[in-house]
Amino acid sequence: MDLVNHLPDRLLFAVPKKGRLYEKCCSLLKGVDIQFRRSNRLDIAISTNLPIALIFLPAADIPIFVGEGNCDLGITGLDQIKEADMFNSVEDLLDLQFGSCKLQIQVPAEGEITKPEQLVGKKIVSSFTKLSVDYFKTLENVEDETKLSTSIRYVGGSVEASCALGVADAIVDLVESGETMKAAGLTAIETILQTSAHLISSKKPKFPELVERIHQRFEGLMAAQKYVLCNYNAPRSILSAVLQITPGRRSATISALEKKSDENEEWVAVSSMVEKKKISDIMDDLKKAGASDILVFDIGNCRV
């Protein structure tokens, strides 16, 4: 079925059909209010509230579908985008900051190899052959892949078993916690790429306004997850000091408070977005500076 022509009135949004990115993708789609129901047997889901069709694809295929203009939007790993050699063919809209891992060179922990230069001329296996070839071309200072002295072969699964089975001297694979590699008797000697899930779009989308709308929703959702709203009261005399602590994303919101009859000093109310991971220290610093009535609120969603 030609989905581009079969669904001409809908933006096609490619998302991973399974694997390490799938569950989080579904959660983010809910967060940006793309409502849908997916049948277990179908890899297409029609949004019930937006002119969008979700296309569930292998993560490795998504950069190609988006880069060639078959889909307007996609979510996949940066590693998959670069492995497909499509980074310059798509718009990299946003790092979604999940699915973080490292593409690493791993060697037997009890072996003699401790640095990548020792692998020149040896056997490497990986499911990321392009990125591996690019790395070793740079290492060997050659431009033509055929002139590589290092052998790089493709293995689709259980890459970590390759060294123990005698297939390879080293592997190049994605590593999240490192526990699987450690259990296989491997250790990292080089990180080729730091990767995470990215929101990408076609360079010539069929629905540019809707692409930008969804992009803004994802940006707002990411900001809501990163920031909290900090409200507090402070004497006007210390305003410059407390604003150094809570400058806000662009600037803080300041409102004058009604002066009580028994007060000699004017007070202001301050509202500012601050990074969630820093909030405890920020509250301590505000209290020390002389602020009071310090309150913190979660941000459900926003537009930035």
From Swiss-Prot:
Protein name, UniProt field: ATP phosphoribosyltransferase
| Keywords carried by this UniProt record | Amino-acid biosynthesis, ATP-binding, Cytoplasm, Glycosyltransferase, Histidine biosynthesis, Nucleotide-binding, Transferase
Pathway connected to this protein:
Amino-acid biosynthesis; L-histidine biosynthesis; L-histidine from 5-phospho-alpha-D-ribose 1-diphosphate: step 1/9
User: What domain of life?
Assistant: Eukaryota
Which biological processes are named by the entry's GO terms?
Answer: L-histidine biosynthetic process
Localization per Swiss-Prot or TrEMBL = Cytoplasm
Which Pfam families did the record assign?
A: HisG (PF01634), HisG_C (PF08029)
List the taxonomic lineage.
Eukaryota, Fungi, Dikarya, Ascomycota, Saccharomycotina
Q: Which organism is it from?
A: Debaryomyces hansenii (strain ATCC 36239 / CBS 767 / BCRC 21394 / JCM 1990 / NBRC 0083 / IGC 2968) (Yeast)
Q: Does the keyword Cytoplasm apply?
A: yes
Query: What's in the GO CC field?
Result: cytoplasm
Role noted for this protein: Catalyzes the condensation of ATP and 5-phosphoribose 1-diphosphate to form N'-(5'-phosphoribosyl)-ATP (PR-ATP). Has a crucial role in the pathway because the rate of histidine biosynthesis seems to be controlled primarily by regulation of the enzymatic activity.
- Extract the InterPro entries matched here: ATP-PRT_HisG_long (IPR020621), ATP_PRibTrfase_cat (IPR013820), ATP_PRibTrfase_CS (IPR018198), ATP_PRibTrfase_HisG (IPR001348), HisG_C (IPR013115), N-reg_PII-like_a/b (IPR011322), N-reg_PII/ATP_PRibTrfase_C (IPR015867)
| Protein family (similarity comment) | Belongs to the ATP phosphoribosyltransferase family.
